[in-house]
């Protein structure tokens, strides 16, 4: 154990952006690590974390820094609300599960909700998404029940408890539908989702990606307009964490793996063709290089980006730090999600 601790201290001390995020210098990393090990050392926490599939480096590279930000925010803000954004497949749900466990270890009780929970019921959602050229009826702006989401955030801010709808992706042959609701109580609200914090953007001639059809370009512009409806929701958040892939094409590989797990569990899952169309729809609806810009200072009362993290193709953390410390994937890589090349992704 002493040798393992020494190696970990050495590895963490070399990560300049990681230390900047946590306000540490090389000399204080060892003492900081000992405090975290004390907090995480109970059998209950160890067993709960072991039950969450993750790469070993994710604990110290992503999970602990994020829960430290949450703890810091909780000390200064009553009933804080934070957003967690990342393209499909980055492991936001897993990260949310980890925050629920780690929050308890650090002395607070987070409510973890997904923007997917707030999808409109299928008939209403299908009607709202009828103009979608990808024939996908969940995911893009306009498919969420913003009235319920805003009510959840406001009820939590006022009372520390709220109602969150449940969405079952396995219903309706993989299209998914609402399945009741759950009452939650806590002292921190974490909202995760692929488009959390996304803002209206000015679409250019190569948006959403080079080679897009006229219908896809029109859909992209429409979704940008619809993002204006989400602005008041994002203003209810105190900060954002962005988790991004090293290359945009990793997202399809991760979603293929997720659908395979869904299929093995006996639940409805999307076919390969449906999945390609879904990912292409996501990119056309909210191009992350346009709608999520971590270095842009909010001027509309929106939440600031507090932390960014980059994952490689195996979901290993390769960089983490404050905005500007992590490289943003080049917009040109978005062409990997275009109709002509999406089948070769991954």
Language-model segments: residues:
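N-terminal pre-Walker A segment at the start of P-loop NTPase domains
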Residues: 49-74
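Conserved NTP phosphate-binding and transfer environment spanning the P-loop NTPase/kinase superfamily
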Residues: 2-37, 60, 195-346
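Short hydrophobic/aromatic beta-strand immediately N-terminal to the Walker A/P-loop
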Residues: 83-85
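Walker A (P-loop) phosphate-binding loop of P-loop NTPases
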Residues: 89
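Hydrophobic positions on the alpha1 helix immediately C-terminal to the Walker A/P-loop
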Residues: 95, 99
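Phosphate-binding/switch loop-helix module in NTP-utilizing enzymes
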Residues: 152-198
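Conserved nucleotide-sensing/catalytic segment adjacent to the nucleotide-binding pocket
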Residues: 53-54, 111-114, 118-172
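Conserved lysine of the Walker
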Residues: 92
């Amino acid at each position: 154990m002493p040798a393992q601790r020494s190696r970990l201290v050495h590895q963490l001390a070399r990560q300049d952006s990681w230390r900047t995020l946590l306000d540490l210098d090389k000399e204080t990393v060892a003492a900081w690590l000992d405090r975290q090990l004390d907090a995480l050392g109970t059998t209950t926490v160890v067993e709960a974390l072991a039950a969450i599939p993750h790469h070993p480096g994710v604990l110290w590279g992503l999970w602990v820094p994020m829960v430290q930000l949450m703890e810091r925010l909780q000390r200064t803000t009553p009933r804080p609300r934070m957003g967690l954004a990342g393209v499909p497949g980055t492991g936001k749900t897993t990260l949310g599960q980890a925050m629920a466990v780690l929050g308890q270890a650090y002395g607070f009780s987070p409510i973890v909700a997904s923007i997917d929970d707030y999808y409109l019921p299928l008939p209403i959602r299908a009607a709202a998404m009828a103009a979608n050229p990808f024939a996908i009826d969940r995911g893009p702006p306009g498919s969420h029940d913003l009235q319920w989401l805003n009510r959840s955030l406001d009820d939590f801010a006022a009372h520390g408890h709220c109602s969150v709808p449940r969405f079952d992706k396995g219903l309706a042959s993989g299209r998914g539908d609402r399945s009741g609701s759950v009452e939650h109580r806590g002292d921190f609200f974490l909202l995760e989702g692929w488009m959390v914090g996304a803002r209206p953007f000015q679409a250019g001639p190569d948006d959403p990606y080079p080679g897009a059809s006229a219908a896809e370009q029109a859909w992209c512009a429409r979704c940008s307009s619809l993002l204006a409806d989400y602005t008041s929701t994002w203003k209810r958040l105190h900060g954002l964490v962005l988790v991004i892939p090293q290359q945009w094409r990793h997202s399809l590989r991760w979603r293929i793996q997720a659908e395979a797990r869904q299929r093995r569990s006996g639940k409805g899952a999307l076919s390969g063709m449906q999945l390609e169309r879904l990912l292409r729809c996501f990119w056309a609806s909210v191009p992350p290089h346009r709608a999520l810009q971590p270095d842009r200072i909010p001027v509309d009362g929106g939440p600031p980006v507090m932390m960014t993290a980059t994952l490689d193709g195996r979901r290993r953390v390769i960089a983490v730090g404050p905005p500007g410390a992590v490289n943003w994937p080049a917009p040109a890589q978005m062409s990997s999600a275009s109709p002509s090349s999406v089948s070769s992704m991954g």
